Amino acid sequence: MSRCDLHIHSSFSARSQEWLFRRFDFPDSYTKPRDLYALLRDRGMDFVTITDHDTIDGNLEIADLKHTFISEEVTTYFPQDPCQLHLLVWGISEAQHAEIVALRENIYDLQGYLQKASISHSVAHPLYSINGKLQASHLERLILLFKHFEGINGLRDALLSELSRDLLSGLTPKKIEELANRHNLQPTHSEPWQKIFTGGSDDHGGKFPASAYTETPRARTAMDFLQHVRTGACTAQGEGGTPLALSHSFYNTLSRFIQDRFTEHLGPSAVLLEAMFSRFMEGRDPTEFTLREKATFIAQGVMSGKIFELAKPANVSLWKGLSKHFARPKVKAQLAKEMEGVAEPERRTFLMANMVCEQLAFRLFEKFVQEIRSGNVIESMQALSGIAPIVVLLSPYIYAFHSQAPSRRWLQGVFRQMTGAIPPPLQNRKRAWFTDTLEDVNGVANTIRKMTAAGVAAGEKLIVITSRRDLTVDDIPIKNFRPIGEFELPEYELQRLSFPPIMQILDYVQREQFSEIIISTPGPMGLTGLLAAKMLNLQTSGIYHTDIPEYVRILTEDRFLESLAWSYMHWLYGQVDTVFVNSEQYRKCWIDRGFAPEKLKILPRGLDTDLFNPTRRDVSFWPGAGANGSEVRLLYVGRISREKDLDVLAAAYHKVRETGLPVKLYLVGLGPYSEALAAALPDAVFLGYLSGEPLARAYASADVFVFPSTTDTFGNVIIEAQASGLPVIVSDLGGPKELVEDRVNGLVTKAHDAEDVARAITLLARDEKLRMRMGEKARKSVLDRSWPDAFQRFWHTTDL
């Protein structure tokens, strides 16, 4: 077999096609043609050619070497159409190059010339839109015009190569006839439904030549090789590109750019920096040098007469700072753990760069939070601004992830138009659910765990992504990223949030090829999920679980902060494709705030009616909890926090007790308000956190469920109590009221009105038959709820 990388660039390529490089006037490549020749031969290529953009100068540099031929990557256009297209043209002469330059503005003229002159050629990266103008109509005409297409491109995302092959392999004579009639354009070649695939690395940085290539039967000469390609006796081999490979090439080009432009200004320290950068690119400690290497640096300094420049404060500071950081035992141990089993230099480099940058970013963020708490706004902004240089250092990675990400929505449109169907890789089959909370005692965590478990049982691909230091949940698919650090929320100190490893999460989402990001919380993980979706062009759903602005108002008593919270919520949920809310009230609320009605969906909720069941009533449950058996048992289940309006419950309970009615209040849950509420309710019983069977027994063994919260958007505890046969008392503000039919299966009271809550408690406490009747109807109202059914409705809402 014979091999040749039929798509590769040298330092003779014109201005870079990458926006990041054009923005800073970086060259497309620094790889010298003769160096490239040696690399390709070392990597098993039998023939060598260079496909620089619209030039053959690089080929002329190696024309005297064996097994070479002249090629180029031609930029061309359809007439009066700004869409850029690239053709790979191989085995040409200087005279033919001149003809190609003259004809390249019109793809029809260019194709005719190439065919007439029997010049081997192929459409490069057919599904990659070079300047954002590519449409299905362009692809349809390319199919009619050309026989050869690049089947594996080693630079662009592997999904694009896979989809290109799928699209072109599925052509039929009938489809070709349809395209010819649509565009009034006859195919230029025989059997146009049978395409030939070529492969090339499209390497620009000199790091990944021959990562993809074209293979033919054994060829004695370059012309024999190209004859095999022309007749279709060839296959595309190798692998598609990744963001890490692209960014690795970027860093290499950047290093060469700095060496080229600034070596004289850097003096002898340039050698040191070059060596450090070389180690960095190999994923090794950039400060760890052998005795021999150190001696070489000193010798070079002596020979140049600039030995003392190496001792300048700036150079010493750089060396000392980096050496000190990498010498720390904790850093060494963490670095060793991260690198264990990782062989690819680009991944080792990525892990090292992220570890250092993320730790620095968290220190600056901690400073920001400290200054905010101290009321030092200017100082806090200064601390936050320090993150900007870190973003600049990581910009090649950030750019690579985004530029490599295929536009799934655009590709779906192309396939719909051209085939009438969406191929499996573009269907919404694998989703990541981002959350800041999973172990906490709240409805958000409960919903995520129940819904995910139902998804697993249904055989769907759903993974929860979070970032917690200590995570004990293991009954559902979870990817937990150890946080860089944690911080407390002001005014809500018991709620700790994580500072997640953002770039590692982005890399994971890209590698796992998720099709949709589900965002459950507006915290750091929710923002990370949104960033990943935007960077990788993924479909998004957001779930508005919690009325955050109302929480902020209650906790801070500050209307300005409440308005800021609303602005943030509006921005966050405005970014996603679909917003799930928990009730019709909140759906109307978001419509009033300008959201399109079709964007807003009600989140289906399930319930385990076998677990939460009146048959679990246990008369022996309460004596152990301090009951005397003759009292009417009032039950609250939920987080013990101020925003749950528990002060209203406390006041109402006191009013009822003052009338002499035999009632006893039991509270299940934990939270930051526990101590204060216990002091306000010395005769109530606090049971702490309960779950599973004990919680089900608590529900079923109570008589009335009281939930005065005005901030909940739904209320899982409401339907759990109803399933247990309890009448429920709720307020007329928030989502829970939509779960209760007033005076049928419960009572709806005025929000923040302790007097009205007391009246409702009194009514039910005095009338056992009313309690029983309402409890029976409450149970019937939720019997049709199940988690499998809720999951199916949720999952298929955003299906393609």
Show which residues each predicted segment covers.
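An N-terminally biased module of ancient metal coordination in phosphate/nucleic-acid-related enzymes
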Residues: 1-82, 207
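Domain-core and long-helix interface of multi-subunit machines
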Residues: 4-27, 94-215, 238-242
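Conserved donor-binding/catalytic core segment of Leloir-type glycosyltransferases
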Residues: 433, 627-644, 650-654
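Carbohydrate-associated surface elements
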Residues: 468, 585, 606
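Short alpha-helical donor nucleotide-sugar binding micro-motif in glycosyltransferases
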Residues: 690, 697-702
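Aromatic "clamp/platform" in nucleotide-sugar-dependent glycosyltransferases that forms part
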Residues: 710
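Short hydrophobic beta-strand element within catalytic cores of glycosyltransferases
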Residues: 727-730, 740
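Conserved acidic donor-binding segment of nucleotide-sugar-dependent glycosyltransferases
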Residues: 742-743, 747-754, 763-769
